[in-house]
Amino acid sequence: MYRTTLAVTAIVAGMTAVAAQSDAIQKRNALMKSMWKDGISAPYRMAQGKEPFDQAKAEAGLAKMAEIVAQLPPLWPPNSKPPANPDTKYSSSTKIWDNKPDFEAKLANLTKSIAESRGKAKDVDGLKEVVRSLNQNCEGCHERYQVTNRK
């Protein structure tokens, strides 16, 4: 009976760890997609001239981006490295866990950049500067910590 209880406990603990890993991966993938779709996409298109400038819409996108970025830091716990063959277009590089302080600093820098950009998108030129700054932050992290799995 004792061995059975230990075996069941070990199985449940293992299943819980796998579920937690999967949950973190799914949450961060969903948030990253939402950051583009609901956050920076409209301001980015406006800055490129692909959409008419709308200050309220630009600010709403930046606010959404800030909301999403605030949720990101805890979504890379030690047990949430991506599987060997992820079924998503992009995944997190294992370099994140090799250099967690740098990764966390990049997230903090993005948070700061978003906060500093608020209210600066008063016209297209201001929005272009905001998008340029945010893009540099995003690229700085994605170049090092994002893996493209399939095209």
Q: Which residues does each predicted region cover?
A:
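Bacterial N-terminal signal peptides
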Residues: 7-14
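Sec/Tat signal peptide C-region and signal peptidase I cleavage site
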Residues: 15-21
